[in-house]
Amino acid sequence: MAGTASAREALGRFGEELAAQHLQTLGMTILARNWRCRSGELDIVARDGYTLVVCEVKTRRGVGFGEPLESVTPRKAARLRQLAVAWLTEHAATRVDTTEGTHGYTAVRFDVVAILHRKEDGPTIEYVRGAF
């Protein structure tokens, strides 16, 4: 059983690394990965211009338990919103430095990166901007 948990954790780390790289290629700056508080964890927190992006990463090896995106339920979305408030509270002094000066965030967006990593095909990435 420990081997299975270990394999799941390794798959999750792989997916989060792939997702972070994908977001960076889109021009985002990664601010935090696996940020934790008492209420839970945010996979990736990034900056996209003046927008704070909270990104949930779902990685699966197959679709036997459903597509990766299907696991982001309304309940999960509500929890991520609460965690985003906690992150913003903890990082109240965080500002976005730009060529025009220093500004706060003007919006928060919730994105999802779903990765299906089948051995025969390699990983495929589905990115949903503003998923909820």
Swiss-Prot record:
CDD domains: PoNe_Nuclease. One of its GO terms (molecular function) is nucleic acid binding. InterPro entries: Restrct_endonuc-II-like (IPR011335), tRNA_endonuc-like_dom_sf (IPR011856), UPF0102_YraN-like (IPR003509). Pfam families: UPF0102 (PF02021). Belongs to the UPF0102 family. This is UPF0102 protein Acel_1550. It comes from Acidothermus cellulolyticus (strain ATCC 43068 / DSM 8971 / 11B).
